[in-house]
Amino acid sequence: MCTVCGCSDGKASIEHAHDHHHDHGHDHDHGHDGHHHHHHGHDQDHHHHHDHAHGDAGLLDCGANPAGQKIAGMSSDRIIQVERDILGKNDRLAADNRARFRADEVLAFNLVSSPGAGKTSLLVRAVSELKDSFAIGVIEGDQQTSNDAERIRATGVPAIQVNTGKGCHLDAAMVGEAYDRLPWLNGGLLFIENVGNLVCPAAFDLGEACKIVVFSTTEGEDKPLKYPDMFAASSLMLINKIDLASVLDFDLARTIEYARRVNPKIEVLTLSARTGEGFAAFYAWIRKRMAATTPAAMTAAE
């Protein structure tokens, strides 16, 4: 996981707003403590031939230890400590973001998926159809280019592009700075489109109300079992490209069953960013969440 491997080096590039700016009066600390790239070289040539007569001879499980991962030269205890330090700092910044969103009565969603699942196409349709009902802003995360933010802006909705460079996910500091560059979204919606990656974004709280995992019918039914942390961390699974399900012989019931093995409480909606099928149900879900996050509703829930 990138909490210890150092893929995020604090050198994200965040666009300046396009004719929009609002001053939140907050200072942000954007560095990641202890993020370094490690290159583990071996001076010896190893020529080992192992004959295993074990039932699991075909499986090398590097996650079968207290740290949940294996890194050359680091003990499980050290991995756990480094991860705690990095995530602890991020969690403090995420709490700051969450407080700001609450003060602005902004409902923030963190959209996560593997590359090519259709997050951006989904967002383009959604913001186009919701922009007359809500103030909307979008934060786009990619390693390079502003292509996705430009697609959002073409709808008339403001978007800030965050290029993470070598980083494989957004973090709370990046989101806080990008939010500063959006127009004021008082009482509106903030969509955060994370970098396409079903691993690292699961660990990083951005201050969002919830994570929405976008999954497409082209990915196969077992993705929730292969990447359980992301599905466990998400409140809603949007199954995109449902218009292709019959062509692909996609088993919807099996996919939902796999997702609920990992997260029994996950909600599931099917839709097609291409045809618009299922978007009415998605908008109803958003409006229900909006109603639940009004100041009166939040006070009653405490």
Curated annotation (Swiss-Prot):
Residue ranges, annotated region (Disordered): 18-61
Keyword field contains Hydrolase: yes
Binding residues annotated for Ni(2+) 1, in chain numbering: 2, 5, 7
Binding-site positions, Ni(2+) 2: 168-169, 200
A single MF term (Gene Ontology): nickel cation binding
Residue numbers spanned by region G-domain: 108-269
Highest taxon, organism lineage: Bacteria
Comp. bias (Basic and acidic residues): 18-32
GO biological process, one term: protein maturation
Signal peptide: none
Family: Belongs to the SIMIBI class G3E GTPase family. HypB/HupM subfamily.
Job description of the protein: Involved in the maturation of [NiFe] hydrogenases. Required for nickel insertion into the metal center of the hydrogenase. Exhibits a low intrinsic GTPase activity, which is essential for nickel insertion.
Name of the protein in question: Hydrogenase maturation factor HypB
The species this protein was found in: Bradyrhizobium diazoefficiens (strain JCM 10833 / BCRC 13528 / IAM 13628 / NBRC 14792 / USDA 110)
